[in-house]
Amino acid sequence: MAKRCEVCGKGVVSGVQYSHSHRQSKRRWAPNIKSVRAVVNGVPKKVSVCTRCLRSGKVQRAI
């Protein structure tokens, strides 16, 4: 599954995680992406959307 929102473009962010002893390890933070059926140009289509776009109403779900 894609790790990028098709509505807002939110994607994976990389960075460094620090342990308690301050040792570093590289890691990735992935957005909460859901695969939903949404109406795109009047046609129901399966799209990958982040949960923030779903909650804010930027996506019209197909029933």
Curated annotation (Swiss-Prot):
Keywords: Ribonucleoprotein, Ribosomal protein. Pfam families: Ribosomal_L28. One of its GO terms (biological process) is translation. One of its GO terms (molecular function) is structural constituent of ribosome. It comes from Clostridium novyi (strain NT). SUPFAM superfamilies: L28p-like. GO terms for cellular component: ribonucleoprotein complex; ribosome. Belongs to the bacterial ribosomal protein bL28 family. The lineage of its organism: Bacteria, Bacillati, Bacillota, Clostridia, Eubacteriales. HAMAP family: Ribosomal_bL28. This is Large ribosomal subunit protein bL28. Coiled coil: none annotated.
